[in-house]
Amino acid sequence: MVKHSEYFVEPRPNGTWEVKLPHAERASAVVDTQSEAIQTARQFAPEGVIHVKQLNGKFRRIG
């Protein structure tokens, strides 16, 4: 299994949050809250970097 070191957490129009690889068209996971999305991304990439897109459109980096 390939391990990735970078994931993006972004809000969806319906209010849920998605966890995606950079440049991916489809989400790796969809969850109800930003907190859950960050936890999921951390499970996918324990030592990786997570970029969280905030509701204002700016990104913040975790890890």
Predicted stretch roles:
Residues 2-26:
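Short aromatic-glycine-(Arg/Gly/Cys) micro-motifs in beta-strand/loop hairpins
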Residues 27-35, 60-63:
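Short amphipathic beta-strand/extended segments with alternating polar/hydrophobic composition
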Residues 47-63:
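Short, mixed-charge low-complexity intrinsically disordered segments
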Residues 2-4, 40, 53-54:
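Amphipathic, Lys/Arg-enriched alpha-helical "gate/interface" segment within cytosolic domains
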Residues 19, 37, 50-52:
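Generic recognition of well-ordered secondary-structure surfaces with a strong bias
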Residues 31-47:
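A short, charged, amphipathic alpha-helix used as a generic interaction element across diverse proteins
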Residues 1-2, 63:
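Absolute protein N-terminus
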